[in-house]
Regions:
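Alpha-helix initiation and N-capping motif
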Residues: 40-43, 79, 92, 112
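Polar/charged low-complexity regulatory segments
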Residues: 21-58, 118-166
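Amphipathic alpha-helical packing elements
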Residues: 57-99
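N-terminal amphipathic/basic-hydrophobic helices that include classical n-h-c signal peptides
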Residues: 1-19
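Amphipathic protein-protein interaction modules
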Residues: 86-141
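Amphipathic secondary-structure elements and adjacent low-complexity, charged linkers
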Residues: 13-14, 18, 25-29, 104
Length: 166
């Protein structure tokens, strides 16, 4: 018989572990928002930005930006709760297990797939943001007619920001 209180999902670790797992986003971009973890888009990029933010190596990348908000609204998690769990030093798989266990909005695999597919096609939906998007495409390469959505822009901007040619 085990009368001890349940252990926390992840024991606290030295913050140097978080720094060791963090990407330096001043030297390379986070993962594409298209990369999936447990079916979720955005999550791997979000974890990269969270780890880099904690390590002070996030550069121009902002944790909990509007794109990240799609993930938080879909799962019901708060940015603060996820960031607190990232501090544990957990890797991607353990973070996914934590998300699935602690997300207030429990989603089926089909719901996650449909949401992820939607995020890959979502575009800027108000006039001001569409104008901003158009200006950004002009800045990156006005000849690019293949750029339609948020993920297209983020992928290209990441590429160009680190020396690529659009």
């Amino acid at each position: 018989r085990n009368d001890e209180a349940a252990l926390p999902a992840f024991a606290p670790v030295d913050e140097s572990l978080v720094a060791m797992n963090a990407l330096n986003l001043t030297q390379r971009p986070p993962r594409s928002p298209r990369v999936r973890l447990g079916g979720y888009t955005i999550l791997p990029r979000l974890l990269d930005k969270a780890r880099a933010t904690l390590a002070g190596t996030n550069g121009d990348y902002i944790y909990n930006n509007p794109n990240d908000g799609h993930f938080f609204r879909f799962t019901g998690l708060t940015p603060e709760a996820l960031l607190e769990q990232v501090k544990s030093g957990a890797g991607d798989w353990d973070m996914l297990l934590w998300v699935n266990e602690h997300a207030p909005l429990k989603r089926t695999a089909l719901e996650i797939q449909q949401w992820a597919d939607w995020t890959e096609s979502v575009s800027f939906n108000d006039v001001e943001m569409r104008e901003w998007f158009t200006d950004q495409i002009k800045r990156l390469n006005p000849a690019r007619e293949d750029l339609r959505g948020t993920f297209d822009y983020l992928d290209l901007d990441d590429f160009v920001s680190f020396g690529g040619v659009a």
